[in-house]
């Protein structure tokens, strides 16, 4: 005996996971070396990480939204100029377009570099005092919020292995280049606190799941009520039929028959 699906069953069928295609993962732009702030004449290679179809590694590169003719999985910039600054994105054959990566090229003698300007508590901070064309620099010192930190007679990278909130702030480096005392522009380093979810809040479901459960409960109650009501009527009609209690009415026009 064929039966129509109830609203609850239809809702369950529509909400079954996997009944619709999920969005492909995003491609990712990686820098080599990992500095997103450069001086003129520097070189950098942008690499696109993502899934490719078999025998097809063509990549779509964009600079400030404009398509770049390069279709290789990597894009190299040599002898960088200020004009190379901007947002770069990439897209592979089986991955969605990446989030934009901002690259900045500056004119000057000295520049502070870091692979990341935003870190979580417990992660490492790595700072580099970079000179134009890697010219020798001496008596290098790093500063945080105007206060001198580490000092060396030779150039070096400043590492903070386990960052805390107090390690965030404005940083710059200073040194001697060809008898000139030079300083880089300050850059903000952000240390974000670890977010541990509250046990009470984590117990509750997301709002859309709560609404779904409420709707499901309402439809189930309606379906159950309709089911028992129809069943009662059908059972009563069946008993009347068996007991001969069914009354047939005649059309008034048939009185003379």
UniProtKB/Swiss-Prot annotation:
State which residues carry a glycan (glycosylated): 64, 134, 162, 181
From the UniProt annotation, give the residues forming the signal peptide. Answer: 1-19
Checking InterPro entries in the record gives:
Ig-like_dom, Ig-like_dom_sf, Ig-like_fold, Ig_Fc_receptor, Ig_sub
Q: Which cysteines are joined by disulfide bonds?
A: 48-90, 129-173
Instruction: Give the source's domain of life in one word.
Output: Eukaryota
Name of a matching Pfam family? Ig_2
**Which regions face the Extracellular side of the membrane?**
20-209
Query: Where is this protein found?
Result: Cell membrane
Topology in the lipid bilayer is annotated as:
Single-pass membrane protein
GO biological process terms held by the UniProt record: antibody-dependent cellular cytotoxicity; cell surface receptor signaling pathway
Q: Where is this site: Important for receptor turnover?
A: 223
Alphabetical keyword list: Cell membrane, Disulfide bond, Glycoprotein, IgG-binding protein, Immunoglobulin domain, Membrane, Receptor, Repeat, Signal, Transmembrane, Transmembrane helix
Query: Which body tissues produce this protein?
Result: Expressed in polymorphonuclear leukocytes, pulmonary alveolar macrophages and peripheral blood mononuclear cells (at protein level). Found in spleen, and at very low levels in lymph nodes but not in thymus or liver.
| Outcome following mutation: residue 186 to A | In clone 334.8
> Which GO molecular function terms does the record list?
IgG binding; IgG receptor activity
A single GO cellular-component term on record: external side of plasma membrane
* SMART domains registered for this protein in UniProt: IG
Q: Which residues cross the membrane?
A: 210-230
Task: Tell me which parts of the chain lie in the Cytoplasmic compartment.
Answer: 231-257
> Which stretches make up the Ig-like C2-type domain?
25-104, 108-190
Its biological purpose is as follows:
Receptor for the invariable Fc fragment of immunoglobulin gamma (IgG). Optimally activated upon binding of clustered antigen-IgG complexes displayed on cell surfaces, triggers lysis of antibody-coated cells, a process known as antibody-dependent cellular cytotoxicity (ADCC). Does not bind free monomeric IgG, thus avoiding inappropriate effector cell activation in the absence of antigenic trigger. Mediates IgG effector functions on natural killer (NK) cells.
Q: How does it assemble?
A: Forms a heterooligomeric complex with ITAM-containing signaling subunits FCER1G. Interacts (via transmembrane domain) with signaling subunits; this interaction is a prerequisite for receptor complex expression on the cell surface and intracellular signal transduction. Binds the Fc region of antigen-complexed IgG.
Please give the name of this protein: Low affinity immunoglobulin gamma Fc region receptor III-A
């Amino acid at each position: 005996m064929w039966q129509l699906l109830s609203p609850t069953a239809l809702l369950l069928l529509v909400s079954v996971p996997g009944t619709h295609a999920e969005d492909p993962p995003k491609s990712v732009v990686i820098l080599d070396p990992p500095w997103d702030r450069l001086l003129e004449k520097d070189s950098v290679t942008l690499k696109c990480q993502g899934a490719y179809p078999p025998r097809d590694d063509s990549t779509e590169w964009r600079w400030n939204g404009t398509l770049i003719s390069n279709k290789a999985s990597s894009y190299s910039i040599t002898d960088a100029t200020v004009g190379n600054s901007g947002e770069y994105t990439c897209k592979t054959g089986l991955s969605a377009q990446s989030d934009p990566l901002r690259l900045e090229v500056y004119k000057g003698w000295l520049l502070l570099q870091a692979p990341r300007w935003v870190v979580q508590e417990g992660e490492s901070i790595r700072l580099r005092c970079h000179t134009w064309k890697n010219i020798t620099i001496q008596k290098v010192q790093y500063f945080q919020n105007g206060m001198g930190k580490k000092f060396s007679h030779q150039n070096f990278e400043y590492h903070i292995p386990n960052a805390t909130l107090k390690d965030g702030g404005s940083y710059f480096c200073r040194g001697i280049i060809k008898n000139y005392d030079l300083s880089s522009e300050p850059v903000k380093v952000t240390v974000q606190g670890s977010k541990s979810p509250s046990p009470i809040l984590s117990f509750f479901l997301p709002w859309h799941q709560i609404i779904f459960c409420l709707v499901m409960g309402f439809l189930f109650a309606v379906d159950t009520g309709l089911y028992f009501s129809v069943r009662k009527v059908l059972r009563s009609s069946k008993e009347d039929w068996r007991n001969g209690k069914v009354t047939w009415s005649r059309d008034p026009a048939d009185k003379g028959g």
